[in-house]
Design a protein with these regions (language model features):
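Active-site segment of extracytoplasmic enzymes that catalyze sulfate/phosphate-ester chemistry
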Residues: 71-169, 173, 200-204, 214
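Long, internal low-complexity/basic segments
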Residues: 4-59, 66, 71, 100, ...
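Formylglycine-dependent
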Residues: 133-179, 187-276, 285-294
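C-terminal accessory region downstream of the catalytic core in glycan-modifying enzymes
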Residues: 47, 180, 187-188, 250-256, ...
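Active-site His/acidic residue clusters
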Residues: 71, 220, 265-313, 351-353, ...
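A short beta-strand-to-alpha-helix junction
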Residues: 57, 81-88, 106-110, 157-168, ...
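Histidine-centered active-site microenvironments of extracellular/periplasmic hydrolases
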Residues: 193-201, 291-296, 305-306, 329-386, ...
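C-terminal cap/loop subdomain of S1 sulfatases and analogous C-terminal strand-loop tails that border
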Residues: 204, 208-216, 350-372, 387-391, ...
Length: 540
């Protein structure tokens, strides 16, 4: 008996040690049991009419959203990843053959709230979607001392975190004109009752409900992996994400290739099957978000890049651009290019936790900040039937505008029972001369609040009473904080009043924050200096 008890104690001690080291694997283990991943299965899309009716029809709409794409990841702005040595001709072509908006802004500095703004035309905080859905396990791992344990006590279960069904989404509105709407890829707006894509207006969905998925299985011979051991987010993703998609509300199964290629091929099929009716395709890639996994052929093609992480990341950009080229090619081959609105953007800026310093160059800040690096994004619209090639518009536009712009193109009136924060940007950009767009844009996460109007940007950090005022018209990279002197006190007072007025209109968060952590503005998380550096406090 004594030996048995000693053995039991040893087993318990070993088990306790292992749990203390690897407890963050628990969500993935539970998910694998409750929602197992099957082998690959074919996908049968609904088919539209065999022939076109010949009647005039509203334009198709293709909304392409990259995930954590840095402003400097593409070569359109004469930069690009790896010193511009990885061309992005397909992405660039959307801008070159249409309009590029020099001051495009995301809905938020993180993934999910931006997507809420994209699909509702409302500030994410007006919806109450202030924070990216997170489990307490994730928050505890990534936040460290910034973890708010008391808020985890009554924290809602994961299936209650998402976009409320009472919100009107873009596909729901487009249904008024007979659009067939398909969502591909990353959803991140909830997986509970009333929150899935097919319950939020999409006719069909193929992708993953949470905020990420593996691009391939880690041990696949055709994948190259790059793990960021210094990053707790990366550690959590490798431990818990699955290489899996689901079709509509079915069970999860494995794709048959690298996720980016898989989504691109499925998008081509959707275009083919719906070529004879108006369709809305929401193509939400998860590239180049971590975990960094590149297709081996793309990695091998970039032998000139010495750094393994940068090479893997660049290979993911290469695959993303190739996939977008295939989608554009499908539109062309079916004679749909002229009357298809193609919109390209990213959900937020590049992430400092990747460890690559130039992702958002020339801007300061990262994903998880409201500095320009976190929210200033590529924003392109192509519609050959209506938009002359090579256009440019310089006033600030944002993700909330995509809702209104797409509905105007489709001939659908905006809902009248709620505030819509976005506008039809083509109404401004296609005039000659182009009128400025002067309305304020607003962002908030906890006590970190920002307003932008007419090129003037005010950032307030209430937790530590910080203020930043920038004139982006003269200082687009936010180098000179004008709040520190008296010269711009009038502008500061005006913007502060605008910020507080907008802040008062926003909803209470749908769930509490679990994180309040300092985020470095100018350094990647693996290169934090020993001396003082500028931070913001991010709530989530």
């Amino acid at each position: 008996m004594r030996n048995f008890l000693i053995g039991l104690a040893i087993v318990a001690a070993i088990g306790g040690y292992l749990f203390s080291q690897y407890w963050y694997y628990v969500p993935g283990i539970i998910s694998a049991i409750a929602d197992p991943v099957g082998e690959n299965q074919p996908v049968t899309w609904q088919k539209g009419p065999a022939e076109s009716s010949g009647d005039s029809r509203p334009p198709n709409i293709v909304l392409i959203v990259a995930d954590d794409l840095g402003f400097n990841d593409i070569t359109f702005y004469r930069g690009g990843i790896a010193g511009g040595s990885v061309p992005t001709p397909s992405i660039n072509s959307i801008a070159n053959e249409g309009l590029h908006f020099t001051n495009g802004y995301t809905g938020n500095g993180t993934c999910a709230p931006s997507r809420a703004a994209l699909l509702t035309g409302r500030f994410a905080t007006r919806v109450g979607f202030e924070f990216t859905p997170a489990t307490p396990e994730f928050a505890q791992l990534v936040a460290g001392e910034g973890y708010i344990a008391e808020n985890a006590v009554d924290y809602p279960p994961s299936d209650e975190l998402g976009l409320p069904g009472s919100e009107l989404t873009l596909p729901e509105m487009l249904d008024q004109r007979g659009y067939h709407s398909v969502a591909l890829g990353k959803w991140h707006l909830g997986g509970g009752k009333g929150m899935t894509p097919t319950e939020q207006g999409f006719d069909e969905f193929l992708g993953f409900l949470p905020g990420g998925a593996m691009f391939m299985e880690e041990g696949d011979s055709q994948v190259v992996n790059s793990k960021q051991d210094f990053d707790p987010i990366d550690k959590f993703l490798w431990a818990n994400l699955k290489y899996a998609v689901r079709f509509n509300d079915g069970d999860r199964f494995k794709p048959d290739s690298h996720m980016t290629d898989y989504l691109s091929r499925q998008a081509v099929r959707v275009i083919e099957d719906n070529r004879n009716r108006p369709f809305f395709l929401y193509l939400a890639y998860n590239a180049p978000h971590t975990p960094l996994q590149a297709e081996k052929d793309d990695y091998d093609a970039l032998h000139h890049i010495a750094d393994h992480t940068e090479r893997t990341y660049a290979a993911m950009i290469r695959g993303l651009d190739r996939g977008i080229g295939d989608v554009l090619g499908a539109l062309e081959s079916h004679g749909l290019s002229d009357n298809t609105v193609v919109i390209f953007t990213s959900d937020n800026g590049g992430a400092g936790y990747v460890g690559l310093p130039d992702l958002n160059k020339p801007y300061r800040g990262w994903k998880i900040t409201f500095f320009e690096g976190g929210i200033h994004t590529p924003y392109f619209i192509r519609w050959p039937a209506k938009i002359p090639a090579g256009g440019q518009y310089d006033s600030a536009v944002a993700h909330v505008d995509i809702f209104s712009t797409a509905l105007a193109a489709a001939g659908v009136k905006l809902p009248q029972d709620r505030i819509i924060d976005g506008v039809n940007v083509l109404e401004y950009a296609l005039q000659n001369p182009q009128p400025p767009l002067s309305r304020p844009l607003f962002w908030r996460t906890g006590g970190y609040k920002v307003v932008l109007q007419d090129g003037w940007k005010l950032q307030l950090q209430e937790q530590n009473d910080k203020t930043w005022l920038f004139n982006l018209n003269q200082d687009p990279t936010e180098q000179v904080n004008l709040s520190l002197g008296e010269e711009h006190s009038k502008k500061l007072k005006t913007l502060r009043a605008t910020l507080y007025e907008l802040d008062s209109q926003m909803a209470e968060p749908l769930w509490p924050t679990l994180i309040e952590s300092p985020i470095a503005v100018d350094y990647t998380i693996d290169k934090l200096p020993d001396t003082a550096y500028e931070t913001i406090i991010w709530s989530n």
